[in-house]
């Protein structure tokens, strides 16, 4: 019987070493050499401290900052571990919403967000990504339209000209990859850092 089991055990050990140890270490090493920033998590450092990642969104509530997409991520309720509470941009629990298009709770939330945004900028159409969560709940980017929609509020809150803030948005807008893939986008954290740097000058 041992004769029959031995080849299977040898294959198990060999594949475990190759797939579970050698391959991950090799890929991590290669990534660290070829793409050091991305391999380390695309971390953004300010004044020697890590303040975020270019790959994970953050919640900004202050009027003087651009806001990202809504996030449907949650966390365990400290008062009752069998329940969850809203925890926007919780990278430990990446998820979208389970609410479907016929959900009253979802429709009420979207309507409330639209009304709030309309009050902020009555003359413009509300971009869809400002009222809909992404599938991961961690999207760090918004469309240029969503950023431009927020320009009047941010300019007002900071005492800046709308034209100057608009130019900053345009400067932070990334185009399609190779001119073909994806959509133009703006990283919210990078935009807010650029805004802070401009305001300090």
Swiss-Prot record:
Q: Which family does it belong to?
A: Belongs to the KdpC family.
Q: Extract one GO cellular component term from the record.
A: plasma membrane
Task: State the organism named in the record.
Answer: Rhodopseudomonas palustris (strain BisB5)
Which PANTHER family does this one have? POTASSIUM-TRANSPORTING ATPASE C CHAIN, POTASSIUM-TRANSPORTING ATPASE KDPC SUBUNIT
Sorted alphabetically, which keywords does the UniProt record give?
A: ATP-binding, Cell inner membrane, Cell membrane, Ion transport, Membrane, Nucleotide-binding, Potassium, Potassium transport, Transmembrane, Transmembrane helix, Transport
The way it spans or sits in the membrane comes to: Single-pass membrane protein
Q: Which InterPro entries match?
A: KdpC
Q: Which sequence ranges are marked TM in the entry?
A: 10-30
Which protein is depicted? Potassium-transporting ATPase KdpC subunit
Q: Where is the composition biased (Low complexity)?
A: 70-82
**UniProt xrefs under NCBIfam families:** kdpC, PRK00315.1, PRK13999.1
An MF annotation (GO) of this entry: ATP binding
Describe its assembly.
The system is composed of three essential subunits: KdpA, KdpB and KdpC.
Q: Which stretches are tagged as biased composition: Polar residues?
A: 83-105
Question: Subcellular location, in the record's words?
Answer: Cell inner membrane
């Amino acid at each position: 019987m041992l004769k029959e089991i031995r080849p299977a055990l040898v294959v198990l050990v060999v594949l475990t070493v190759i797939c579970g140890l050698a391959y991950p270490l090799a890929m991590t090493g290669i990534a660290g050499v070829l793409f050091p920033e991305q391999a380390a998590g695309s971390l953004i450092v300010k004044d020697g401290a890590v303040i975020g990642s270019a790959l994970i969104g953050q919640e900004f509530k202050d009027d003087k900052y651009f806001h990202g997409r809504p996030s449907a991520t949650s966390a365990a309720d400290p008062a009752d571990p069998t329940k969850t509470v809203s925890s926007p941009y919780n990278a430990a629990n990446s998820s979208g919403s389970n609410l479907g298009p016929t959900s009253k709770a979802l429709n009420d939330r979207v309507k409330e967000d639209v009304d709030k945004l309309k009050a902020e900028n009555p003359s413009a159409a509300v971009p869809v990504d400002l009222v809909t969560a992404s599938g991961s709940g961690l999207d760090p980017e918004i469309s240029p339209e969503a950023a431009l929609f927020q320009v009047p509020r941010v300019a007002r809150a900071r005492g800046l000209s709308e034209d100057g803030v608009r130019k900053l948005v345009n400067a932070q807008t990334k185009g399609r990859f190779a001119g073909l893939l994806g959509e133009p986008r703006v990283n919210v954290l990078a935009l807010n850092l650029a805004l802070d740097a401009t305001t300090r000058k």
